[in-house]
Amino acid sequence: MSIIIKIHARQIFDSRGNPTIEVDVVTENGVLGRAAVPSGASTGEHEAMELRDGGKAYLGKGVLKAVENVNTIIASELLGTSVFEQNLIDKIMIDLDGTPNKSNLGANAILGVSLAAAKAAANELGLPLYRYIGGVSANTLPVPMMNIINGGSHSDAPIAFQEFMIIPVKAASFTQAMQMGTEIFHHLKKVLHDRGLSTAVGDEGGFAPNLAGGTEDALETIKKAVQSAGYTFGDDIMIALDCAASEFYVNGKYDYTKFEGTTGKIRTSEEQADYLAELASKYPIISIEDGMQEDDWAGWKYLTEKIGHKTQLVGDDLFVTNVTRLSRGISEGIANSILVKVNQIGTLTETIAAVNMAHNAGYTSVMSHRSGETEDHTIADLAVALNCGQIKTGSASRSDRMSKYNQLLRIEEELNDVAYFPGAKAFKK
């Protein structure tokens, strides 16, 4: 056994300049595992709770309480534990916290230790993280969903939907997918520049232009960039949307005026689903995330029955990487895919359980970053380890996003002939 002899947390900064937590786990052999924890801007009501300090420092967003919880309470319980006992490590922390949403010790504190322990274990064995977690069957490179236009809570653009993503489904490899995606990104910059629009980027590296025509203007602009790059819109490149509908759900209605002003419409649940179906019939949209509000189960059911047979419907705020909510969705036939965010649930063990439950039920899974990221690229390894087949980790800019893509390039190179890139096969038919 390789025993944990030291656990140390510190406060660092994420890509938005907000504090976050980083944890080191050290074994008796002097092997280090280090993990930094991400943070979201649009967070689901049912997510595990990250612990923030409050007060004036860092506008209340400090994480020194979470750091202290790791360095005192958690460390004292885990020192002497084998670093290979991942399930036990996570269970001890869950029991220590004692709340359903990890609000006592903080999901950020618990997750930092959970991921750092896994990294230390992998390093002890001299294995890459994806191989340690996924074993010999971990060989699927995820298809990237590249977020090239940002709206909603991720930018100041007057568009309700949070993300407009391109998917290089005709790529033969992850490397080629990156080439296609980055070329389109740079062509989009020129298209926007030629229209006199801003080419500043949002939290996830996508552009945040003031597109007066709203959603369809964004889609048409992407179409032009795809064609300008020499690719076929609707064949080489498909589209994914993250509506983040909970962000503009007001008094039981989908209120687009929150982000789009007087030009925005107010829709009922059925009207919202019908609108998404209309968009999916007009444009090559093969994936829609959070098209309905997180607790609008009836709306989700209607949407799933309407287009779930041909469109991937991803539950993010709906499922929050939580097996309890996912189990309900599966039993009621709601959505057909789960977004996977490690900090929504707070431990590696629970993340793996959610992905396994989804796959066993025939749901697809999409590994995902958060809008507040760091240079940590753990989710790249997790996407391969769990054979997710898809990943959301931002646009082709900002090193906090590119670090994940670069790690996947390394993994594909390492796997060589064993690497499998599913392309369009990764998506729900």
UniProtKB/Swiss-Prot annotation:
Its main location: cytoplasm. Transmembrane segments: none annotated. PROSITE patterns: ENOLASE. Binds a second Mg(2+) ion via substrate during catalysis. GO terms for molecular function: magnesium ion binding; phosphopyruvate hydratase activity. Pfam families: Enolase_C, Enolase_N. (2R)-2-phosphoglycerate binds at Q162, K341, R370, S371, K392. Pathway: Carbohydrate degradation; glycolysis; pyruvate from D-glyceraldehyde 3-phosphate: step 4/5. Its cofactor is Mg(2+). Mg(2+) binds at D242, E289, D316. It is found in: Cytoplasm; Secreted; Cell surface. NCBIfam families: eno (TIGR01060). Catalyzes the reversible conversion of 2-phosphoglycerate (2-PG) into phosphoenolpyruvate (PEP). It is essential for the degradation of carbohydrates via glycolysis. This is Enolase. The gene is eno.
